[in-house]
Amino acid sequence: MANEKPTEEVKTENNNHINLKVAGQDGSVVQFKIKRQTPLSKLMKAYCEPRGLSVKQIRFRFGGQPISGTDKPAQLEMEDEDTIDVFQQPTGGVY
């Protein structure tokens, strides 16, 4: 029975994780597993770096609202399998 309690604690710990989808403008969807209390900057960097993008060039939105790197899934009341939309910030322009 003593072994059962740590197993239950591990299950509770797994509830601290959330699976999030990040949807790009090109229709691609990437899934991330992140702790509910982890700042979203970690997810943002993990999305941008393999694509050769700077976090400063990209805008992340959840439910139509902009999110920042200091936001956490728990703060934004994100649920498992929620989707974060990614938009490339327009740069420059000639008139």
Curated annotation (Swiss-Prot):
GO MF term (any one): ubiquitin-like protein ligase binding
SMART domains recorded: UBQ (SM00213)
Function noted in UniProt: Ubiquitin-like protein which can be covalently attached to target lysines as a monomer. Does not seem to be involved in protein degradation and may modulate protein subcellular localization, stability or activity. Upon oxidative stress, conjugates to various anti-oxidant enzymes, chaperones, and stress defense proteins. May also conjugate to NFKBIA, TFAP2A and FOS, negatively regulating their transcriptional activity, and to NR3C1, positively regulating its transcriptional activity.
Keyword Lipoprotein: no
Keyword Cell cycle appears in the UniProt entry: no
A GO biological-process term: positive regulation of DNA binding
The name this protein goes by in its record: Small ubiquitin-related modifier 4
Propeptide segment residues: 94-95
Disease link: Type 1 diabetes mellitus 5: A form of diabetes mellitus, a multifactorial disorder of glucose homeostasis that is characterized by susceptibility to ketoacidosis in the absence of insulin therapy. Clinical features are polydipsia, polyphagia and polyuria which result from hyperglycemia-induced osmotic diuresis and secondary thirst. These derangements result in long-term complications that affect the eyes, kidneys, nerves, and blood vessels.
Numbered residues of crosslink Glycyl lysine isopeptide (Gly-Lys) (interchain with K-? in acceptor proteins): G93
